[in-house]
């Protein structure tokens, strides 16, 4: 028994060391799992954010083309409203599921900015469907849509901790 008592401090040290190693490994694995899960969700949110922007931009481009046909926009590929309607319907149908994914996975700030952007696009669509020739009013709608897009992209960058990006406003036609 005397020999056992002499070895007891060493045995306790081994047990404490083993428990310490176990705790360190478990905590390290948990931290790695949380980091990997966060990275996966960030990648997924980025996909959802980009997909929403792509689907909304389809509608924007179609409104530019119809507005060009009406003489409100300088877009180089005009399209009359009759030809555009099925394309607009398709763009809207594609926009709805990506909007639902955005609501599900997006941060409240991003969703709010997306709402502001899509509202501006819907106003452009309503204006275009009236077949009005008013370049000044169209320009105001375009400016609101562009501000909505900038707000959306800024919110996405903030949510994903990305650096600030380009505003997306560049001169395509000399003023």
Model-derived segments and their meaning:
Residues 19, 23-175:
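Conserved non-transmembrane functional hotspots
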Residues 1-13:
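Feature marks short, highly hydrophobic, charge-poor N-terminal signal-anchor/signal peptide-like helices
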């Amino acid at each position: 028994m005397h020999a056992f008592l002499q070895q007891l401090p060493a045995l306790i040290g081994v047990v404490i060391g083993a428990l310490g190693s176990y705790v360190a490994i478990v905590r390290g694995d948990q931290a790695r799992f949380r980091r990997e899960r966060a990275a996966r969700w960030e990648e997924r949110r980025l996909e959802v954010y980009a997909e929403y922007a792509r689907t909304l931009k389809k509608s924007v481009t179609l409104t530019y083309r119809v507005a060009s046909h009406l003489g409100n926009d300088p877009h180089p590929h005009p399209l009359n409203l009759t030809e555009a309607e099925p394309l607009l319907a398709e763009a809207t149908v594609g926009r709805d599921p990506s909007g639902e994914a955005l609501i599900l996975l997006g941060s409240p700030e991003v969703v709010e900015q997306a709402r502001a952007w899509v509202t501006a696009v819907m106003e452009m669509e309503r204006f275009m469907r009236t077949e009005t020739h008013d370049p000044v009013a169209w320009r105001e709608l375009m400016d609101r849509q562009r501000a909505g897009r900038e707000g959306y992209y800024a919110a996405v960058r903030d949510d994903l901790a990305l650096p600030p990006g380009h505003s997306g406003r560049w001169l395509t036609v000399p003023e």
